[in-house]
């Protein structure tokens, strides 16, 4: 661990067979799950695949926000708090749920891509492929935006895992 890795909030994690993993935690699709929970509080049901398809069809500039903002780490009214964070950046807040979902997924993709670039730089390695695992690997919009933002190939799966 160096001062540079500490500043980047990167650490080492012991693993199987004496392996050590370079690690940086990034907020995940919990931002989307909590936003949906807020929207469903009125008793309505959100069709997630349909909402993600609508988000994929959103055109024009998509506002990005820092997905790891500590103000977004607690549950409750997350869509409202995300909108406030976007507004603070001076970007227009999406007027639709699909627009906000696109912003959430694009912001996560940017955070993931930035993490991969940072870890590659700190490790002195060129990264060619991102393996996206866990439930997010089923989200084709996330996979595509991550590939677009990182410039790398994204391999999706397995679903039964929780690390990038």
Q: PLM features: residue spans?
A:
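Active-site core segments that coordinate phosphate-bearing ligands/cofactors
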Residues: 1-130, 138-162
């Amino acid at each position: 661990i160096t001062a540079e890795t500490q500043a980047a909030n990167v650490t080492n994690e012991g693993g199987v067979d004496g392996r050590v993993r370079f690690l940086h935690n990034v907020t995940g699709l919990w931002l989307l799950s909590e936003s949906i929970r807020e929207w469903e509080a009125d008793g309505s049901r959100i069709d997630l695949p349909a909402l993600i398809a609508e988000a994929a069809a959103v055109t024009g500039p998509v506002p990005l926000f820092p997905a790891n903002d500590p103000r977004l780490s607690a549950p409750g009214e997350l869509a409202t708090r995300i909108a406030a964070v976007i507004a603070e950046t001076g970007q227009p807040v999406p007027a639709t749920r699909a627009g906000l979902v696109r912003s959430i997924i694009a912001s996560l993709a940017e955070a993931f891509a930035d993490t991969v670039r940072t870890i590659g730089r700190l490790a002195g390695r060129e990264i060619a492929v991102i393996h996206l695992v866990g439930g997010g690997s089923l989200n084709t919009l996330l996979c595509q935006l991550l590939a677009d933002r990182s410039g790398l190939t994204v391999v999706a799966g397995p679903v039964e895992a929780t690390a990038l």
